[in-house]
């Protein structure tokens, strides 16, 4: 989530950068689940984008949420740009085009994720409905051009907007037109981090297919099942992708630091101001060679903020962030944490998942990742269709959740949250393929019904 960190301690050594990541190590008893989801606001009348300004704008929506929740406002130059729950740790923030993001508090079970989600959606509806605002659960806006989409008043996004066209074809589409759901999970040691990172990077295309949900652009079928995932293939390859070096000997926190040091920066924040340093490396900044800050060393805040501008398919911070899934309607959202918790928080399933992926080489992993946005379940790796691998992974996740045996107050375990994925596997079609069937059938070639059927 794009919320800036504040720790102005100057950094003296590379070891401090490594230690910042290593501080994420925690005992298994303290493992938590974090879920972040984005949703696109639209006007209930006319299905248009919602501006920031005005009595029915996104700023007004955030003001209403502040009064309802009592959360701390996050302000920038007099504008409310988010909310933070000081006690629980959750937050609401804005993506560049007004996509409304809930960063959930760290919770112990997927049941709690679902409860938090339901409470959040009820609260959002209470404020949004009188303002005439609805929210869409797709991976990409289905009908609007980029030019139609408003720009949120956040300094970091202005810098990114200027920089993106220099480094890729689709960066502005990523910023302004896409939505995701992400799951954040813990690790118990450096070795545990490496194993979970490798498994989740290799299998991220499985999640992309299971959640593929962005087949429309500007009112037409775009030829992809997850155009959002395709967008990431040409956004900024210096900071995204399948990080093949993570599978090499010697992978650990230090290797991630070396990678991050050479990822081009976007900005440095000083006070309320964002200073544009786009394209310069953190390594030069660390060595006192940034022309905007001559002889000045970065702070821990600068490091934490820089790490939040790196976008591989799985991101390491003080936890691992699964980044491959499209945004989906509310009833499918808990299925993403359920999938990854079942695979990564159970040792038997984690070992079995690694057995699936450990013999794939970097070229095979990359080819699968490149094919999945267009072909979904019909993408292939070696002699297998991705559908077969996805079916196996959902089965492993189910078994992992069953062994976890975390029960809700009705005595049900977390496997029930996998039901949307099991239905997808039984149907043999991705969510995008189901939507395309509607588009070519009952929707009669219009995407407008999506604003009803896929709304929150």
Language model: regions and residue ranges:
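Short, intrinsically disordered, mixed-charge
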Residues: 67, 126, 202-205, 209, ...
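Long, well-ordered mid-to-C-terminal structural blocks that present hydrophobic/aromatic surfaces
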Residues: 280-364
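Structured core elements
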Residues: 40, 101, 182-186, 321-323
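Loop-rich catalytic cores of soluble enzymes, especially ATP-dependent carboxylate-amine ligases
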Residues: 129-130, 134-315
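Solvent-exposed residues in well-ordered beta-strands and their adjoining turns
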Residues: 42-44, 105, 186-188, 325, ...
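Terminal catalytic/cofactor-binding subdomain
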Residues: 1-169, 177, 332, 336-341, ...
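Conserved aromatic-histidine-acidic binding/catalytic patches
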Residues: 27, 109-112, 116, 184-188, ...
